[in-house]
């Protein structure tokens, strides 16, 4: 009996070792399998990244085949090799009445740091359990530590508006904003957040009504750039880029910034975030999700360099690239 047990343990650990492959990455390979430093697939979809004391932290949706299982956080010093930190925000498995009761949908989490309160504040798109995508709310959670665990605070429709795909943006002066798809995704809106970043203020404006979602924003010099997708469920579509020198508009449509094979479908992906690279002037990475609705956990990541040259933005497909290839923007 004892021998059988030992044999089973040895065999099982062999299977485990064989299935978990840890690779030391030296380059980005968009849309390829990307494992964490333990050799498990990175499970952080619709995500965003912040930089804290020499490390990047990647927050994203933890997905099962279809299930929404909370928000994961990973850390990395080099943007290529990611260590799984923890489930940063869990669904509530105890209180079935909670807005984030197990069975809810949490999408597109973004985290920013509030210098005044010393808290990391997470906003995400929340759909209530059993209601499909009807609730259209924003959820807010906080933590004193970047890796969490985050405490759920509240969920609401900002100023009464439906809120689905979303992102957060913290400006250089510390003011922060929530950019969100509203009115059944026909409108894209922006609201300035309260000083503690926990609520929207009444400064809440329509950006444009082009039926767009998946907002990803960045600032270069005096301009704000906003990448969005069309609304075709999990299927990819054409991206567009808007520019403004004021977050509340007017926003000018600059067309599709993607270049290369399948660029008219965002290379098979959908925008989620634009990440400023530390220590490189005006260097940004475009982050997108290549969704696999039949097995959401296996949705892949498309990370590509953004080039900004005198206000002209280009995102060119690359099979394989590294940060050395990134040029400072003009
Ligand atoms: C597109 C959105 O961008 C995703 O985040 C997700 O909500 C899917 N629609 C669901 O169909």
Locations of the language-model features?
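Bacterial Sec-dependent N-terminal signal peptides
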Residues: 1-22
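Carbohydrate-active catalytic/glycan-binding domains of CAZyme proteins
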Residues: 20-330
